[in-house]
Amino acid sequence: VGIDPHKIYVTCFIGSEKYGIPKDIESAKIWQTVFKKAGIDAKIAEIGTAEQGAERGIKEGEHIFFYDDHENWWSRGGGVETTPIGDPCGPDSEVFYDFGEDKQDVAEYGKSHPASDGARFMEIGNQVFMQYKRNEDGSFSELKHKNIDFGGGLERIAAAAINSFDVFETSMFKPLIQKLEEISGKRYKENTSDMRIIADHLRGAYLLSAQGLVPSNRKQGYALRRLIRRAILKAQNLGIEQDFLAQIIPLIEKNYTDLSDSILDTRKEVLPVLTREEQAFRKTLKRGLKELHKLRESGLTGK
């Protein structure tokens, strides 16, 4: 991927003395080995709570941090105390990318640390160690069959690879944003929300259509219709009153040339399906706006 390992920071579970759940030293040691392979002598720090992290900050050389269950424990109920009876659960280890100390708003968030809500660190991955079960008496016991559940944010990892906090700066979205700027004559920086929604929704619409889904008023087809129509409404906010999907969809398609054969077979049908929906909705919009204009001219205020 090309991410600088010096900008990677990880967190582990500090343990719960009350419930007899040990500190996740094993994960910390494994992380030290991983960092060492990258030429980094990763020091370990015990933080505890996010509030304590905001007071302490991080020290030079620290890359591995122990936090409490509010940060590094997974269950349906959140923390250790609120884990539902009978549920599987366990500690987790999260991976963060560092965008630089200058990104932290100390006045609002305190000193920077991985679990801060400030802009310095962004979580890009998480390993949940499903190794416990909560018993009827509230205690915890080890599961007979344990597993590791990894989750990684593809777009966040891509953003970290280009050192950008904005996933819409990645190659998956940037061509779409640039085309929207060209069509609308407006800049992304002043219209981030509308352009992000358009790019995100049209990508989703493309992928749904590529699997054979068509816009309708029922179930999945209705979800597809809503995506397309919301993108068009946001385009209206940008002053784009003409059909524009034919300029955007081919840019999305370029990112998915390696899709499975079953999807590739239907891909050629995507653009006609989406543009038909666009044209139909624009006609509906025009009729609706025309009626609203008539009502306004009649003096009807809505009060």
Each PLM stretch: what is its role?
Residues 1-261, 271, 275-300:
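Structured aminoacyl-transfer and RNA-binding surfaces used for tRNA recognition/handling
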Residues 265:
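Conserved catalytic-core motifs characterized by acidic clusters
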